[in-house]
Amino acid sequence: MIQIGRPYIEQADKNFRLTADVVMDQETKKWWFEVPAEYKQYLCTERSDAFLIGILPLAMRFGEDISLDAPVTEELLFNIETELIPSLVNSSKNLYASRIFAETETEIINEGAWGVGTGNSMGVDSFYAIEMSLHNHCKSYHLTHLCHYNVGAFNDTYSTAGEDEVREICLRNAKQVAEENGLPMLISNSNYEEIVDINHLFVNTYANLYAVYCLQKLWKTYYLASSEFGFHRFQLEDNDMYDSAHYDLLTVNCLSTRGLK
């Protein structure tokens, strides 16, 4: 059983962290997501949504159930239990149908949320999402923020090249892109990869959506850029052996709610 305590906010120098105490294998760890002070008000302590999304692939891969002290959004839990978990388990060789123990809430926690965001990783997929949003004629879907979430991609993907150096270069270029488009650049940090110690390819979708839900009081819409894996390449069979982006169309649908799409 993985036990996740009620989220709370801690200060870390000039930044603030959304933190939860996690008990796994009889060891307690602090799991945190850090943002600059101006985003503190958007960190969500009232729900466990972010931490459930983030821990789910680990629990399913290692046969663990999940207990959460803070409530979960009822719509989100319903989608996970009735659609996401059965679909993944039935199309894999090794995944476990984790049981989730949590109270639920039906109230929309981010009523009045106004943010529209997407990642700014400097990849072709994120550039497409930025271009599509900025020039769409539907103005309520125009971007308000570009984001850089440090949730494990650099540590796995660029470990041989030097993750700190590569991240610094990407950040510098990403800030320039944000400035050229007149958008704020939201830069966060997390110890996600220390808690969910799995190859990032298997969890990248969950890692990014964990970050999104940590700030769910900000977002009404978030674009998850997913290169190459549209309807024509959707793949669920043996999903535990492949990049989680292969089934983003399922994951993103199941992990959307009335308050956050």
Functional labels for PLM-detected ranges:
Residues 1-23, 45, 50, 54, ...:
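Nucleotide-activated chemistry modules centered on ATP-dependent adenylation/adenylyltransferase
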Residues 23-45:
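N-terminal, positively charged, Ser/Thr/Ala/Gly-biased leader segments
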